[in-house]
Amino acid sequence: MTKKQSPVISFKNYSFQYRAQKRPTLTNINLDIYPGERVLIAGPSGCGKSTLAGCINGLNPCSNPGEATGELIIDGVDATKSSIFELSAHVGTVLQDPDGQFIGLTVGEDIAFSLENSCMPQDEMHQITRKVAELVKINNHLDYAPHELSGGQKQRVSLAGVMVDQVKILLFDEPLANLDPATGKQTIELIDEIQKETDTTVVIIEHRLEDVLWRDVDRIILVSEGRILADLHPDKLLATSLLGKNGIREPLYLTAMRYAGITLTPEKKPSHADRVALPEDDVKQLKQWFQSRMAGKQESEREPLLEVKNLSFGYTKGQRTLQDVSLTIRKGEMVSIVGKNGAGKSTFSKLVCGFEDPDQGEIRFAGKDLLTENIRHRAKHIGYVMQNPNQMISKTMIFDEVALSLRNTGMDEAAIRERVEETLKICGLYPFRNWPISALSFGQKKRVTIASVLVQNPELIILDEPTAGQDFHHYTEIMEFLRKLNEEGVTVVMITHDMHLMLEYTDRAIVIADGELIADDIPARVLTSEAIADKAYLKKTSLYDLAVRCGIPDPSGFVERFI
């Protein structure tokens, strides 16, 4: 891409401070983004990247009051003197949670919403709606209700809804956070196709760096503590140690190369696993590292804790969300359940917790029939953390939310305070203990819900997407805490789209596709099986691609030994 003379987004000595905060969230930002560029903004939670995005689309200060100093020009418009309505004609925003962006009762109504507001003639409105729907490949679902769509389809509708205004800038706020790996890959491909078709400027805020880099980006803007720490081409940034030092996960294949003692340089093209250019000496070094690693040890059989036999369930008559699922979770295991959106993973957890009753099958916990027990009894032994934290939170303040279940048991207030504060420290929430929950980000709310379950000391914890919306620092903090809990005897089951989590933290992966259990194996074998990956909408790990590219004869073994 050739840079044009005038930037479409231009920050000059720009700072922003929320009215409720004592210090600026953004300090002295100088940044130019040019027409047609694709830019990734990365940084740890709370670094200011979402605030930066909010300044671009006008949410700050129009909806979130605060004081801005310096200059911000968006597509020739002075953003500091413009309304959010004026800026929306230039910037289209796709939110992290697409459910929060739906307005219409059908897909077609939702896409056409802004056109209706501008009193466009119906014939012209229908023509534009159909054209944009075709561009995002959702044209066969115009009569569907939003709740009938998958997560990836909802993202497409949200994108279409902002594209009808023919905006010059598309801003994506963590578009992959709630998507399975294959759908996330398709989303990045869609963004790539749309940008090539429309020459739109694309700004992406995302923690899943490796997934975004599936297609080229021009620059990565690294934000830390409200300042721009780096503004570099991906190959240049990935050759440094800046990502790890600032709480951001680098692509897994780069970690493997570093483990092998390989020096990364921009010339080796480290931003793509399938294009990385390693000289023969580096390839030899990687092979020697692989041969020196010991294969993982087999663990002895453990006592069964949760036993499921021939479990079937459907939300509507004649349709099965789960079909004849049988599995055993043993005491002290740390297990991942993976599969595409809508495969039946969350439904399985609802049946175990008693939120739904199965059509047929058995569920036993520690040898006892769970189907004879109510939800309250099951909750004494099984903790469940939902994917959407807003569906769990019922109190205004953080401390009160985490303390709620203990107070319901009549526990002494001093004992409650001690246990709650200990849990908040573990989850990285202690400094915010007296904050209102409304002031938290999506990822912080997620940690509140995890804390509210962990405080009860359950025998089995089921977590639905525990790391969604978390930066690498908080991801590692939560996962290391869960690993510590697991080492102390708590059984942990995680429903996840995060293949890194599955590889690094679990010894076993249960794969569900279209309501059926299709695999139950070690994660390395699951993520190196093309048949399983395709059927379950997973994505083969980049470690496998690196091993194949370097001619390692046993790519699956390479992945297993790396983990």
Describe the predicted segments one by one.
Residues A42-P44, V338-K340:
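The feature captures the beta-strand-to-loop junction immediately N-terminal to the Walker
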Residues N57, C353:
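Helix-to-loop junction immediately C-terminal to a conserved catalytic motif
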Residues P65-V77, G361-D369, R378:
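Conserved ABC transporter NBD signature motif
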Residues D123-H141, A414-F432:
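Conserved ABC ATPase "signature" region
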Residues A145-L149, Q153, P436-L440:
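Conserved ABC ATPase signature
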Residues L170-D173, I461-D464:
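Catalytic Walker B motif of ABC-type/P-loop ATPase nucleotide-binding domains
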Residues R227-Y253, E516-L543:
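Conserved beta-strand-loop-alpha-helix hinge in the C-terminal portion
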